[in-house]
Amino acid sequence: MSLVTQIIVNADDELRYPTIGELQSIQDYLTTGSNRIRIATIIRDKEKEIIQKASKQIFQLHPEYIAPGGNAAGSRKRSLCLRDYGWYLRLITYGVLAGDKDSIETIGIIGVREMYNSLGVPIIGMLDAIQCLKEASLEMLGQDDIRIISPYFDYIIRGMS
């Protein structure tokens, strides 16, 4: 649900008009609309480059993942990791475009920690991978865009912690 929709639903549930603070949140969201679209476009267009940088960084941090017997050993396991990285980048752009974290919660974070645990994927590695994706993504963006996108990466990191 978008920020605007969430504010309207909350106000309607409470049989009231949106508060001054809620209206200000809507105004802030609307004035950053072109930034949000630009961020989503950059992340989409630079996805392969971002994933390449992030994967290089994560495998330098955790070389044991690509060593024989590691969770990303071999081309098949490694490609599954990289697929997940693309999935997280898409989740981030959904949140950025919606202006809230509900889409991330609904689509992706619920149960992800349990799934990784059941598959034997080290959570610390996923947390580090999301941080690496964040750093690689931020290299592509300006300061205004960084302020918009960073909380969505941080939300996923906190949700998986």
From Swiss-Prot:
Topology in membrane: Peripheral membrane protein
One Gene Ontology cellular component annotation held by this UniProt entry: chloroplast thylakoid membrane
Keywords in alphabetical order: Antenna complex, Bile pigment, Chloroplast, Chromophore, Electron transport, Membrane, Methylation, Photosynthesis, Phycobilisome, Plastid, Thylakoid, Transport
Residue positions where N4-methylasparagine is found in the record: 71
Major localisation: plastid
GO biological process: photosynthesis
InterPro entries for the chain: Globin-like_sf (IPR009050), Phycobilisome_asu/bsu (IPR012128), Phycobilisome_asu/bsu_sf (IPR038719)
PTM notes: Contains one covalently linked bilin chromophore.
Record-linked CDD domains: APC_alpha
Pfam families with a match to the protein in the record: Phycobilisome
Signal peptide: none
Localisation: Plastid, Chloroplast thylakoid membrane
Residues at which (2R,3E)-phycocyanobilin binds: 81
SUPFAM superfamilies from the UniProt entry: Globin-like
Role description: Allophycocyanin is a photosynthetic bile pigment-protein complex with maximum absorption at approximately 650 nanometers.
Family: Belongs to the phycobiliprotein family.
Matching PANTHER family: ALLOPHYCOCYANIN ALPHA CHAIN (PTHR34011:SF2), PHYCOBILISOME 32.1 KDA LINKER POLYPEPTIDE, PHYCOCYANIN-ASSOCIATED, ROD 2-RELATED (PTHR34011)
Record protein name field: Allophycocyanin alpha-B chain
